[in-house]
Design a protein with these regions (language model features):
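A solvent-exposed interaction/effector surface
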Residues: 1-151
Length: 151
């Protein structure tokens, strides 16, 4: 697995975020949330430009959000999607290069590294930022940033 094991401290920017939220085990909720989000994205694109694809998740209560960063604030999103401003903040960033099927293993390793390195976390969403477009990028060349909220 091609995962950076030394994190980079970054300040994640504020994001106008449109998403589908699911609760429960991520192995079931993540694919379901992304399926709905992708289905609804065509309606979203009729009114907004998508800047980024990203998921936000909390491990404790098992909240998973699949969604899109858009260019600015909005009062209207397609039915089935929610909108909020994600404030961003300080994060420790790890980078996975390879297929999305490695994300569960990579995320587990990231949380092991957080403990081993003594990274102090704050209570906020973790982020998966999907850097390359999977429609045009071979799976082994996909890049995903895994970011943990850092105190």
């Amino acid at each position: 697995m091609n995962l950076t094991e030394t994190p980079e401290i970054v300040h994640w920017p504020e994001v106008h975020y449109v998403f589908v939220e699911k609760t429960g085990p991520f192995m079931q909720t993540a694919p379901a949330a992304w399926g709905e989000a992708h289905r609804l994205s065509q309606k979203l694109l009729q009114q907004h430009r998508i800047d980024r694809y990203m998921s936000l998740y909390r491990v404790g209560p098992q909240i998973y959000r699949a969604g899109f960063g858009i260019e600015g604030p909005t009062a209207h999103v397609p039915e089935g999607l929610r909108y909020e401003v994600f404030p961003g903040g300080k994060y420790s960033r790890f980078v996975l290069t390879g297929p999305y099927s490695l994300l569960p293993q990579a995320s587990g390793r990231v949380f092991e590294l957080v403990q081993q390195l003594g990274i102090e976390l704050r209570d906020d969403f973790n982020i998966e930022n999907y850097v390359k477009d999977p429609r045009v990028t071979p799976a082994e060349e996909l890049v995903t940033e895994i970011l943990v909220p850092t105190a």
